[in-house]
Amino acid sequence: MIAKRYSYTLIFVVLVVIALIILRMQLPSMVKDYLNGKLADMGDYQGEIANVDIHLWRGAYSVHQLEITKKDQPSVEFFNAETIDTSVSWASLFKGKVVADVDLINAEIHLVDDEAEDQPEEESTWRQTVQEIIPLQIDRLNIDNGEIHFHNFTSDPQVHLVFYQLDGEITNLSNAERRDGLKFANFDIQGQVLDSASARLDGRLDPLGDFHNFELKLKITGINLTKLNEVSEAYGNFNFKSGNGDFVMELQAEEAQLTGYAKPVLDNVEIFDLEEDLQDGVFSATWQAIVGAFGQIFRNDPKNRIATEVEIRGNLDDPDVSAWQA
């Protein structure tokens, strides 16, 4: 009788083990289907994941080949990442908190400066989706070889500015409800821009908020000014014949009120002056304040070294100030 009872117990254990093995084999596919279902319904955006790996022993999963596009522009990427590895902290989990570390590997984000238009409420849906599929709290998001692309497809010439080889981290990310106020994250990212210039961006913002409150500092050193000709011609109607220098910009927004400055230190500057009319655009209001002012300085006061400071001020709810969008 006892032997028979042990036999039933053994059979039960074997069946449970087999069920767990089958579940483990099916889990990546189940998670992939769940995530793709969420990513397919993000208002004006849509996304897809190619593959998912589950690492139960370390409480982690890896998402591979994530791509997010706009539904009306499927050929233009908004975001893509080769791998996103998310690992949950067991220590925090035992305390009743879901806290994770995330590694973002070979990721790109594309931002577009276009004509002013009202942003539909649906465009916030991608943020809601992020809140649903990532852990409650991200202790650290590590960026490995990332890229940020800025485009203006309507300017003449078109502008394509790329920050690449980006490495750094973002800390204290939270997808908690914003009823109790903003959830600021700190970031410090370094990389390259304009072929050979070094760039560093640091500050704080609420990435799932409305971008009406933030602080940031951008510093670029070792700029070959001729590499800026797309930007200077599109927004300031002049080209650089030669020159090099450094650039610092600090911006702060509080309840949509934007303040800050841009400060270049440029050496051996020569320019080709173009038409006086400035390119109309959306983010152009800020760019024109910076680039247009530089153009006037170059025209009126040519020197071997130029150091000046341009004030930036405005309201982010004003459609003439900014409309970076996917």
Pin down the residues of each PLM region.
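Extended terminal
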Residues: 1-10, 206, 219, 238-244, ...
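Elongated, acidic membrane-bridging lipid-handling scaffolds
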Residues: 41, 123-229, 312-314, 319-326
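N-terminal type II signal-anchor transmembrane helix
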Residues: 1-43
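Solvent-exposed coil/turn segments that connect beta secondary-structure elements
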Residues: 66-68, 86-91, 107-109, 146-148, ...
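Amphipathic hydrophobic-ligand
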Residues: 44-46, 73-87, 124, 155-171, ...
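Flexible, surface-exposed loop regions and adjacent strand-edge segments
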Residues: 116-123, 235, 278-283
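Flexible beta-edge/linker motif
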Residues: 53-116, 127-149
